[in-house]
């Protein structure tokens, strides 16, 4: 038997204070994505805190308690790779331009939206998120390697004798790879 491991569905978060729109967004995306729902910015922040990073956030702009751009702005530092899409039935030009220019919003879509266009936009957002995550991980690994090389070089230069140099190198490598014990033994 050939069992293929299924790739987990990308997570998206939809935020709208109108139950009909929230349900419509859920039904549009649930087959292809794991869809999380919130009816306000504060609730969406709680959901993100519980479930972690999502690939795409689709948020209504005009909501009580917190606007869409305010909510999305609060997610930027903690979830920098998340793609943010704003829905609006109104033209809050100043807010939208500021949000887009500051990098908080990937695209904005006017209500009523075209399902096919929104699906294509979310797919593009998920793909972009995956590329960003991959590049971020590559950069993290490269930085870790450079840091290790720097640490080993400094250890070699500062160690008073060969045995201490080897022990410090092993300890440095152990710290870098987050192991609980690193031992240097002669063979």
What are these regions (language model features)?
Residues 52-58:
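Active-site beta3 strand of CheY-like receiver
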Residues 37-47, 68:
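Helix N-cap/capping motif at the beta->alpha junctions
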Residues 16, 60, 88:
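Active-site residues of response regulator receiver
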Residues 69-70, 91-107:
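Alpha4 helix (beta4-alpha4-beta5 surface) of REC/receiver domains from two-component response regulators
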């Amino acid at each position: 038997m050939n069992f293929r491991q299924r790739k987990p569905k990308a997570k998206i978060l939809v935020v709208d204070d109108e139950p009909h729109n929230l349900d419509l967004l859920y039904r549009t995306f649930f087959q292809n994505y794991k869809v999380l729902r919130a009816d306000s910015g504060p609730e969406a922040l709680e959901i993100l805190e519980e479930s972690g990073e999502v690939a795409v956030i689709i948020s209504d702009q005009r909501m009580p308690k917190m606007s869409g751009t305010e909510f999305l702005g609060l997610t930027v530092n903690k979830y920098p790779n998340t793609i943010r899409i704003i829905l609006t039935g109104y033209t809050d030009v100043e807010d939208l331009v500021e949000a887009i220019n500051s990098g908080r919003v990937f695209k904005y879509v006017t209500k009523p939206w075209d399902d096919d266009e929104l699906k294509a936009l979310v797919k593009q957002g998920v793909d972009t998120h995956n590329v960003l995550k991959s590049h971020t991980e590559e950069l993290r690994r490269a930085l870790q390697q450079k840091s290790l090389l720097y640490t080993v070089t400094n250890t070699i230069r500062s160690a008073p004798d060969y045995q201490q140099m080897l022990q410090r190198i092993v300890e440095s490598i152990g710290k870098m790879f987050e192991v609980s014990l690193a031992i240097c033994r002669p063979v």
